Structure formats: structure tokens, C-alpha cells
Amino acid sequence: MATICNHHVLSCMHGLRENRLAQQPALERAGINPAVMENRSQRVHTDQVARLFKTVQETLNDEFMGFTQNSCKVGLFATMAELVSHCSTLGELLEKAVNFYNLVSDDIPMRLSRSRGNAVLSFKMAKPELDPEHFMAEFWLVIWHRFPRWYIGKPIRLRGPHFTF
């Protein structure tokens, strides 16, 4: 059973707390017992955490879950996925996806560079103070590693993620 530590569960609800919205309904909708949150060492099943992330996004109507100055309407990632669905290479997919997000949002500027057969995908939170526990930065990295890997049906080995924190 794949699990995720409570830190990520608590961190993802930052936007709910900032907007003074109740967290318990989101936990319950995701199938997470709110009592579990009292124990920092407790782990939560990945399916429940995925439901919680989606619930937070839907509650806030913000795919960036309140970690950026401007919201990112729910459905934008799906629109990007549709846009890149006809790409024939990983490079083309990443290029179109980066251009798309840079066009629609200034909150997480992205850059794709290539050198000697390697690609470097970089991004920086425009207002890192809105992501105090670096949840969104880490979540964004996971998304941009897993989505292309799923799309091409092959593993993509990270050579070395680098963080500014």
C-alpha cells in the first residue's frame, strides 16, 4: 500500500486555511479520518491524498491550491493535456506545455533548455512567500516528472532535482 506522510496532507490545505475555509469537510470528502492528522508520523494512502488535492483545488477553484498570487482555474491542466495530446516527441510535449503555462500564468514561470541530449525543465515560484513549506514547488516538480513519463509510456530518470530552498 503506497502512502504519503501527513506533512503533505497538512501542507496542501494551506489555501483552505488562508481563506478561512473548514478543512474537515475536505478531509472527509477524501476519505481521510481527521483524527489521523493529529499524529505527524501517520501516513495516508496515496488515493486518499489524490482525492484531497483534487478536493482542495475544486473548493478553491484553483489548481495552484492557493499557493500563488493568482488562481489557476480548475480544468487548465486538462486543457494543456489536450493541447499536447498530438505531440510526437517528449521534447515537443514539454515545449508546448511550458509555452502554454507561461502564456496563461506568470505565477510559476517555466523554462525548458536542452544541451547534449539532456533537457532541463526549470521553474520558480513568482512569490515563494505564498508557499511557505514549499509544497507547491515540490508538487509542481512531481507533476512535471510524472505527466510526461505517463504520456510517453516510459520512465524518465531525473538526473538531479535542484531546489532553491
Regions found by a protein language model. Give the residues of each.
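N-terminal low-complexity or simple alpha-helical regulatory segments
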Residues: 1-121, 136, 157-160
